């Protein structure tokens, strides 16, 4: 009887110590994820200016080289119960078209012909990408972040500042759509960050790092899972020349590189550790350089996202540039821009072209910077 009692006592103590060890590991991982030890030091690549702060969010951007335009989604804050106008606008990057100094920094809002779409009032655009055909046709693909109508919307630019709504793809698996990367006409990848859309359930999911995120592929007729069991996938970008898909992970603070096969299946090539949480990804078509809009201090970002209406709560912003070397398996990372959140809070999108950089934010303004300090870019 004494031997059985001793064995039971040992088992109980063993279970207790294992439980303490697991809790300690969880707390340690949580502390690392929260970035409690990080600070942000402000710097810019050149003179910067605010293009607009009239909308609660400029969360997504895409560059159409044939038009010299950056298309921008407006009003993401409405998905977090902020009162704001939503829509799509564009910014002209061409500075030699005879416009005045003031006109060079204007945003032009687009009108949308919804063609009878039933839920047009629930349109909250966030992630956006584009496709340009050889005959000059430009298509836009936009994610709707409305909590009850998460869909992918298909548009065609029919006039200079008008959009024609073609269709919408919705699916029960769309719980927290984040970003979109187009690989062909009506062929695209999207990231779904988590099993839960928001709230404490999503926070718990991130804390446990359960890996419920996914990348979905739409081939023009049906939806399929391209990559599963991902931890908080966010921004996504496609390098058409190398056929590489880049997927950011907010919690792992890294970028995954996938080779896109001819049948559009994905093969994981490598993971690039960033030590910051990537939110938006932009790939330069000419160089293949990767530009990343990031949240460098995740606990401040989490507080900002749970209190977006509070103007006194900011989240730092950071832009990284990754230059992939010729051999393709090494890279150089620089930081062209960083801000403590006072100028632009929670950077979520970035575009670079013609020595101009545009930075969008989750709930606030759109920033434009001229890149004149080449030594930091």
From Swiss-Prot:
Cytoplasmic topological segments: 1-13
Keywords for the protein's UniProt record, in alphabetical order: Cell membrane, Cell projection, Disulfide bond, Glycoprotein, Hydrolase, Ion channel, Ion transport, Membrane, Neurodegeneration, Potassium, Potassium transport, Sodium, Sodium channel, Sodium transport, Transmembrane, Transmembrane helix, Transport
Glycosylated residues (UniProt): 94
Species per Swiss-Prot/TrEMBL record: Caenorhabditis elegans
PANTHER family in the cross-refs: MECHANOSENSORY ABNORMALITY PROTEIN 6, PARAOXONASE
Disulfide bonds: 48-369
Post-translational modification: Glycosylated.
Protein name in the entry: Mechanosensory abnormality protein 6
Role, per record: Subunit of an amiloride-sensitive cation channel (degenerin channel complex) permeable for sodium, potassium, lithium and N-methylglucamine, and required for mechanosensory transduction (touch sensitivity). Interacts with degenerin channel proteins and stabilizes the channel. Plays a role in mechanosensory transduction (touch sensitivity).
Membrane spanning stretches: 14-34
Localisation: Cell membrane; Cell projection, Axon
Keyword flag Transmembrane: yes
Cellular-component GO terms for this entry: axon; plasma membrane
UniProt similarity note: Belongs to the paraoxonase family.
Domain of life, per lineage: Eukaryota
Membrane-protein topology: Single-pass membrane protein
Extracellular side: 35-377
InterPro entries per record: 6-blade_b-propeller_TolB-like (IPR011042), Arylesterase (IPR002640), Serum_paraoxonase/arylesterase (IPR051288)
Recorded GO MF terms: arylesterase activity; sodium channel activity
Keyword DNA repair among record annotations: no
Subunit structure of this chain's protein: Component of a non-voltage-gated amiloride-sensitive cation channel complex (also called the degenerin channel complex) composed of at least the mec-2, mec-4, mec-6 and mec-10 subunits; the complex mediates mechanotransduction in touch cells. Interacts with mec-2, mec-4 and mec-10.
A biological process from GO: potassium ion transport
Expression sites (tissue/organ): Expressed in neurons including the six touch receptors, ventral cord motor neurons, HSN, PVD, PVC, IL1, and several neurons near the nerve ring, in the anal ganglion and in the male tail sensory rays, in muscles including the body wall, vulval, intestinal, anal depressor and sphincter muscles, and in the excretory canal.
């Amino acid at each position: 009887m004494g031997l059985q009692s001793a064995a039971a006592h040992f088992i109980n103590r063993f279970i207790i110590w294992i439980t303490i060890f697991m809790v300690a590991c969880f707390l340690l991982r949580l502390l690392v994820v929260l970035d409690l030890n990080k600070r942000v030091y402000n710097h810019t690549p050149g003179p910067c200016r605010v293009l607009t702060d009239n909308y609660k969010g400029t969360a997504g951007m895409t560059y159409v080289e044939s038009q010299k335009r950056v298309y921008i989604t407006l009003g993401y804050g409405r998905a977090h119960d902020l009162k704001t106008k939503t829509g799509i606008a564009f910014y002209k990057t061409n500075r030699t078209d005879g416009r005045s100094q003031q006109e060079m920094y204007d945003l032009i809002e687009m009108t949308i012909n919804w063609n009878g779409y039933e839920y047009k009032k629930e349109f909250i655009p966030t992630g956006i990408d584009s496709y340009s055909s050889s005959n000059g046709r430009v298509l836009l693909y936009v994610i709707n972040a409305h909590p009850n109508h998460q869909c992918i919307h298909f548009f065609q630019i029919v006039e200079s500042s008008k959009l024609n709504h073609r269709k919408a793809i919705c699916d029960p698996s769309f719980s927290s759509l984040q970003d979109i990367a187009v690989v062909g006409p009506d062929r695209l990848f999207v990231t779904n960050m988590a099993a839960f859309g928001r709230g404490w359930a999503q926070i718990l999911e991130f804390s446990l790092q359960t890996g419920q995120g996914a990348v979905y592929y739409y081939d023009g007729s049906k939806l399929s899972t391209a990559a599963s069991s991902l931890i908080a996938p966010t921004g996504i970008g496609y390098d058409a020349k190398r056929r590489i898909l880049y997927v950011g992970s907010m919690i792992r603070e890294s970028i995954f590189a996938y080779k896109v096969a001819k049948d559009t299946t994905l093969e994981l090539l490598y993971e690039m550790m960033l030590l910051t949480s990537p939110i938006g990804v932009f790939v330069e078509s000419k160089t293949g350089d990767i530009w990343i809009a990031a949240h460098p201090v995740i606990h401040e970002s989490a507080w900002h996202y749970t209190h977006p209406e509070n103007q006194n709560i900011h989240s730092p912003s950071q832009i990284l540039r990754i230059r992939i070397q010729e051999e393709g398996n090494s890279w150089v990372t620089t930081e062209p821009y960083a801000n403590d959140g006072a100028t632009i809070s929670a950077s979520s999108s970035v575009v670079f072209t013609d020595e101009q950089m545009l930075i969008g934010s989750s709930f606030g303004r759109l920033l434009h910077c001229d890149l004149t300090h080449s030594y930091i870019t």
